[in-house]
């Protein structure tokens, strides 16, 4: 059974509007899974509308920011699947988790 926090995150994400179609994420089933990994730590899986979507990184970042805006959420990990460049999308969306980059 999903936690109360993950349910609130789902409700928030379902209200986001897709930039390409102008329809809500909840209508499009873009978000495929939301789970609470630890207290305040949320993992969100999503599938872009197209395997070649140029907006996959932007969509992932919007999902992350929206999830972080929910009271009680301390950290968010976003995972993209179904995109031609899943690994790159995931790295770019979650790059701030690695901490600041050292200066050269």
Regions found by a protein language model. Give the residues of each.
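Domain-level signature for proteins that mediate thiol-based redox and metal-cofactor handling
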Residues: 1-104
């Amino acid at each position: 059974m999903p936690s109360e926090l993950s349910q609130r995150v789902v409700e928030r994400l379902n209200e986001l509007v897709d930039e390409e179609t102008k329809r809500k994420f909840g209508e499009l089933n873009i978000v495929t899974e939301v789970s609470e990994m630890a207290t305040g730590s949320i993992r969100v899986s999503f599938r872009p509308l197209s395997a070649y979507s140029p907006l996959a990184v932007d969509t992932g970042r919007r999902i992350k920011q929206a999830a972080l805006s929910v009271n009680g959420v301390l950290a968010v990990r976003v995972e993209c699947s179904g995109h031609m460049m899943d690994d790159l999308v995931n790295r770019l969306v979650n790059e701030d988790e690695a901490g600041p980059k050292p200066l050269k």
